[in-house]
Design a protein with these regions (language model features):
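Residues that define the transmembrane beta-barrel architecture of outer-membrane proteins
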Residues: 1, 36-40, 74-78, 120-126, ...
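Outer-membrane beta-barrel "beta-signal"
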Residues: 80-82, 166, 188-208
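Transmembrane beta-strands of outer-membrane beta-barrel pores
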Residues: 5-7, 21-25, 48, 62-68, ...
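Solvent-exposed loop/turn segments connecting transmembrane beta-strands
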Residues: 29-35, 68-74, 150-157, 183-189
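Short loop/turn motifs that connect adjacent beta-strands in outer-membrane beta-barrel proteins
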Residues: 8-15, 49-56, 88-97, 137, ...
Length: 208
């Protein structure tokens, strides 16, 4: 179940709140082992125009649910996110910039590996990324991420990505990405990814 509502706010600020309740599993984060095991998610979003070309989005999130250890063990997630957009109105198809970042704190109840006693594992992770449109056809971007593991916060993984996007037309997109990852076990990984998108039919609405 999900409810979204626009909240009262000072002039010039758009404020939106979302609350969700659901029962089910969400990968390794939440697990419903009992009939009454439900998870709760809340998000508060604020938007403001800084100028006719620049705007900012700020958000706070909270999630609570049962994890895979059992119904008596919970995981809590706290998140902060921010998005900055620069898009000049008269030249938006030639130049624009988009920056995003998100920080997440995890508090996970579990049994200690040594004594099998209840403990709370506290982990932190974040990512930050940016994309800049060079001209009508080319966009460059980069992303950095770093996160502790939820079950073992003393183990930290990190990674860096660089991407290049080419737009042959408004109906197609070609993207190449290189990613380097360094895992807590001192193992490195190098990945090359390629993506091709195309659209059939009428011209769709432009994204915000």
């Amino acid at each position: 179940m999900s409810v979204t509502r626009i909240l009262p706010a000072p002039k010039g600020i758009f404020l939106e709140g979302t609350a969700q309740v659901y029962r089910g599993d969400s990968a390794n984060v939440f697990t419903a082992t009992g009939r009454k095991d439900v998870s709760y998610v809340g998000h508060l979003r604020g938007y403001r125009d800084l100028s006719e070309s620049t705007n900012v989005d700020l958000g706070f999130s909270y999630a609570f649910g049962h994890n895979d250890v059992g119904s008596a063990f919970h995981t809590q997630l706290y998140g902060l996110d921010a998005t900055l957009r620069w898009k000049p109105l008269r030249r938006s198809i030639y130049h624009h910039f988009l920056a995003r970042t998100e920080l997440v704190w995890s508090h996970r109840d579990q049994l200690s590996a040594a004594l099998l006693l209840p403990e709370t594992q506290r982990a932190f992770g974040f990512y930050t990324s940016g994309e800049y449109r060079l001209n009508r056809r080319w966009t460059v971007g980069a992303r950095y991420d770093r996160s502790d593991r939820a079950r073992q916060a003393n183990l930290t993984d990190s990674g860096f990505s660089a991407l290049l996007t080419y737009w042959p037309s408004e109906f197609s997109q070609v993207r190449g990405q290189y990613r380097f990852a360094r895992y807590a076990e001192k193992q490195d990984a190098n990945e090359l990814r390629f993506q091709f998108l195309f659209v059939l039919g009428a011209h769709g609405a432009h994204p915000f």
